[in-house]
Amino acid sequence: VLAVLLLQKEAGIQHPLRVVPLFETLKDLDGAATTMNTLFNMHWYKQHIQGKHEVMIGYSDSAKDAGFMSASWAQYRAQEELTAIARKHGVQLTLFHGRGGSISRGGAPTQQALFSQPPGSISGAIRVTEQGEMIRFKFGLEGIAMQNLEIYTAATLEATLLPPPEPKAEWRELMNRMTDHSVKVYRQTVRENPHFVKYLRTVTPELELQMLPLGSRPAKRKVSGGIESLRAIPWVFAWTQIRLMLPAWLGTGAAINEVIADQQKATLDEMLQQWPYFQTLIDMLEMVLSKADANIALYYESHLTEDEDLKVLGNQLRQRLKDAVETLLALKDESKLLSDNEVLDQSMQVRKPYLLPLHLLQAELMKRRRDYLAERQAEHTPVDHALMVSIAGIAAGLRNTG
């Protein structure tokens, strides 16, 4: 923050741009309040901001680093702490949410997302990003655009005037316990399994996504490297294409299951009924699980690899997906996903028959492209365009893809 202010001063900028710090990784989110407190304690900085400050909360890298549940809880706590620090220093804080379309990147229905923020964190103003794949759906037509702007305005006013209740101490304690277990399970698979990166690059179109003319940044931060080098959008996009949806549920289902097994379902039920944050978290998890399909993921795997180590890992991931679905149904006392959201359920049932042939076609195109490149030195293949069309078609059908 100070370096950017100094740069503008040295460059002789007469009307300096405001500097908005971004807190995104798990470590940065945990230290956000301390960082801002240090800045606010500087007398000249307090004078410079004139009682107003904007802070950006990032969603992508924290979810890729620690999993959906752990990242979500870290973002919630960071907002609470930032709000308290700003209030202590008499600063009007505006939180800038760098959300994406997928739940791993903070995606959720606008009204639900705003109501699930910590009490007091929305004080008459909010700033959000709308990702590329969502802009056309939300603002492509004048009437729909007006409706979405009205939703933003109404939700901001309601969250300001009628903030949600403070979470109880026992709810916080349970969330801390679940997120600790969630991040452990998530990292055991993503970071510690020696076959995970190879599985990602063999079974999903992670490498092929680099062909797509999408986004403002490259798919990777570095040409080579592991999960750390991959940007958050293609990370989510790749798993979505094969319908495994791994970033959203890995670790989360196991954490909830552990609490239920420990005879604490009554507390979870209370959280689900009385705490908007937890309601939204579970609703978004259910929505993503309803879009997952282990059989489609298995088809990609059987079509693209004969490696026994990868097949073992694939079986483990599909079993964990099944366990996550069963855990969610047990938590909500339901027999099927989306039983309390018939509109979304019907929407998915209508789209699924159109998605299936795209998945079958895509897996075959991926195999043909890789076989073609293995036999000759080339950058492009005859199936590149068809493969890109299949990727775009699946993304359009599933909506919140990256």
Predicted regions: what is each one?
Residues 1-2, 29-31, 104-107, 347-355:
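Short, solvent-exposed polar/charged micro-motifs at secondary-structure junctions
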Residues 58-61, 69-79, 83, 91, ...:
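Acidic, glycine-enriched catalytic cores built around paired aspartates
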Residues 1-25, 29-46, 51, 57-91:
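Core mixed alpha/beta domains of very large multi-subunit molecular machines
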Residues 24, 96-111:
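Conserved phosphate/anionic-ligand binding catalytic regions in large, soluble enzymes, centered on
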Residues 55, 95-96:
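Residue-level marker for buried hydrophobic side chains located in beta-strands
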Residues 24, 28, 105, 116, ...:
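Generic structural "secondary-structure junction" signal
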Residues 14-16, 40-49, 114-132:
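Acidic, His- and aromatic-enriched active-site or binding-groove loops in soluble protein domains
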